[in-house]
């Protein structure tokens, strides 16, 4: 295709950046030996479920303020969140991830808890932005909850005011890594 990865062609590229790293050959040799020996792979059902969960995160929006614009931005073609297996859903019963974005008021807190309770297990929460994380700019207001973690358990915090689409994308990838590492989170 005419693609070269030679660093001499681009003198502005930092050393070690963008280099192609070969996969670990011992891993593939062991995998090939197991398939050749038995004809199939052996794994636990829990590891299989963890792998499947990371590739099919269905999230629901709980956009309360300006952070919701960045949440919409991450679905546009530039970032295309669906290529990571995350797709938006309108119903909490179909979702397993809730992204709380924006200022959570005291009047909205029961609705947040009700939506969280309607989600099926396992369920995960991403708190997006300074207002959702700790009240943000409105922290000292009488009507603002100082962090959505006082209402629902939060798995991933995405900082920023508002956080960029890249930050939310990174937070979702961190949630996928956490699911792979921990499995079904016990609450």
UniProtKB/Swiss-Prot annotation:
Cofactor(s) this protein requires: [4Fe-4S] cluster
Highest taxon of source: Bacteria
Compartments in which it is found: Cell inner membrane
Enzyme Commission number: 7.1.1.-
PROSITE patterns xref list: COMPLEX1_20K
Entry GO CC: plasma membrane; respiratory chain complex I
Entry keywords, A to Z: 4Fe-4S, Cell inner membrane, Cell membrane, Iron, Iron-sulfur, Membrane, Metal-binding, NAD, Quinone, Translocase, Transport, Ubiquinone
Annotated positions binding [4Fe-4S] cluster: 66-67, 131, 161
Keyword Ribosomal protein listed: no
Cysteine disulfide partners in this protein: none
Subunit structure: NDH-1 is composed of 14 different subunits. Subunits NuoB, C, D, E, F, and G constitute the peripheral sector of the complex.
Protein name, UniProt field: NADH-quinone oxidoreductase subunit B
Gene behind the chain: nuoB
């Amino acid at each position: 295709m005419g693609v070269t990865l030679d660093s001499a062609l681009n003198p502005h590229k930092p050393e070690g950046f963008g280099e192609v790293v070969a996969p670990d050959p011992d891993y593939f040799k062991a995998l090939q030996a197991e398939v050749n020996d038995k004809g199939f792979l052996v794994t636990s059902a829990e590891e299989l479920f963890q792998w499947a969960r990371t590739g099919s995160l269905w999230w629901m929006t709980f956009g309360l303020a300006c952070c919701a614009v960045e949440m919409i931005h991450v679905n546009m073609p530039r970032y295309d969140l669906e290529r990571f297996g995350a797709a938006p859903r309108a119903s909490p019963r179909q979702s397993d991830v809730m992204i709380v974005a924006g200022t959570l008021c005291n009047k909205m807190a029961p609705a947040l808890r009700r939506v969280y309770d309607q989600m099926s297990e396992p369920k995960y929460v991403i708190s997006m932005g300074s207002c959702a994380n700790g009240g943000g700019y409105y922290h000292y207001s009488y009507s603002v909850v100082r962090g959505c973690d006082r209402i629902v358990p939060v798995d991933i915090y995405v900082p920023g005011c508002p956080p960029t689409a890249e930050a939310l994308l990174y937070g979702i990838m961190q949630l996928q890594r956490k699911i792979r590492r921990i499995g079904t989170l016990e609450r």
